[in-house]
């Protein structure tokens, strides 16, 4: 009986370790973030009109879903890629000011970080340095979108 309990304990610890490693892999620090002129409010939050990569899977989601969060393209160093990232949410923090915003991944990019909608970029750029430099340095973590 004791052997069975030890086995169960080992399995439980292994599962917890794997889950913690997965959670750690779902965030990144000191990531370069640029901006993109999606301006979804001007195109009725239409992913097809924005030519967003995720339109194939998410364009027919309800309007409330598409406008709940600001948009971003994702090509960060940690987290799922391609279709697996579509519709997921990130909490993005400007490392210079601590300002945070939650965004929804609607597109992919190639800059190795994030390409935030200009509205979100401006919301995070509270000291104006991002605009001056053409990019922000941010941390991000995948979060529940609560949809």
Curated annotation (Swiss-Prot):
Single biological process term from Gene Ontology: defense response to bacterium
Cystine residue pairs: 54-86, 75-109, 89-145
Family matches, as Pfam families: Barwin
GO cellular component: extracellular region
Keyword Secreted: yes
Protein location: Secreted, Cell wall
This protein's name: Pathogenesis-related protein PR-4B
Source species: Nicotiana tabacum (Common tobacco)
Region forming the signal peptide: 1-25
